[in-house]
Amino acid sequence: MGKVYVFDHPLIQHKLTYIRNENTGTKDFRELVDEVATLMAFEITRDLPLEEVDINTPVQAAKSKVISGKKLGVVPILRAGLGMVDGILKLIPAAKVGHVGLYRDPETLKPVEYYVKLPSDVEEREFIVVDPMLATGGSAVEAIHSLKKRGAKNIRFMCLVAAPEGVEELQKHHSDVDIYIAALDEKLNEKGYIVPGLGDAGDRMFGTK
């Protein structure tokens, strides 16, 4: 079973408070999401393998460490996930970026894939799928399914705010995927919004309604 990590770092929690605040404007919301994504990326990459290399400092020859062998990919779920990409790339600029677009079928209410673009070497990469919110879990489940059916084998999921229902749904369908969360909230309301949550992340990020 994949693990669930909830980050309690003071900087993440401080910035998340302003992200949640309904009075935070589009510009600040966007910048704060970017900053929290960077802080979370620092934690999510903590277990990357290292190898020892020989270098020359200005003083003498030395042995030092570099990340070993891992090819990384970041996959935002369109559209709100786009706001987390640059924050991650600040720490791992060599990562390739894919995209998964989903819409909700008006009759079944289930997510339907309409766009997928991934790096050509899918099987060789470790992917971080990102979306600000994990509410019902439907979009995350379908996005990860899209990656797996194209050959991805090593996937992590990262979000700012999650509902217990979404975590349970994602674990039910993708038990091999670790989940990284800035805050695990109380529940979903009758409209499917996370409570207390942060509203509609896409609308707040892009200034739409």
Curated annotation (Swiss-Prot):
> What's the record's note on cofactor binding?
Binds 1 Mg(2+) ion per subunit. The magnesium is bound as Mg-PRPP.
- Annotated GO biological process: UMP salvage; uracil salvage
Assigned EC number: 2.4.2.9
Q: How is its activity regulated?
A: Allosterically activated by GTP.
Where do the annotations place uracil binding?
I194, G199, D200, A201
An example GO CC term for this entry is:
cytoplasm
Q: Provide this UniProt record's keywords sorted from A to Z.
A: Allosteric enzyme, Glycosyltransferase, GTP-binding, Magnesium, Nucleotide-binding, Transferase
- UniProt-recorded Gene Ontology molecular function terms: GTP binding; magnesium ion binding; uracil phosphoribosyltransferase activity
* Top enzyme category: transferase
Q: Where does 5-phospho-alpha-D-ribose 1-diphosphate bind?
A: R79, R104, D131, P132, M133, L134, A135, T136, G137, G138, S139, D200
What role does this protein play?
Answer: Catalyzes the conversion of uracil and 5-phospho-alpha-D-ribose 1-diphosphate (PRPP) to UMP and diphosphate.
So what family is this one in? Belongs to the UPRTase family.
Q: What is this protein called?
A: Uracil phosphoribosyltransferase
Q: Which organism is it from?
A: Bacillus subtilis (strain 168)
Q: Which gene encodes it?
A: upp
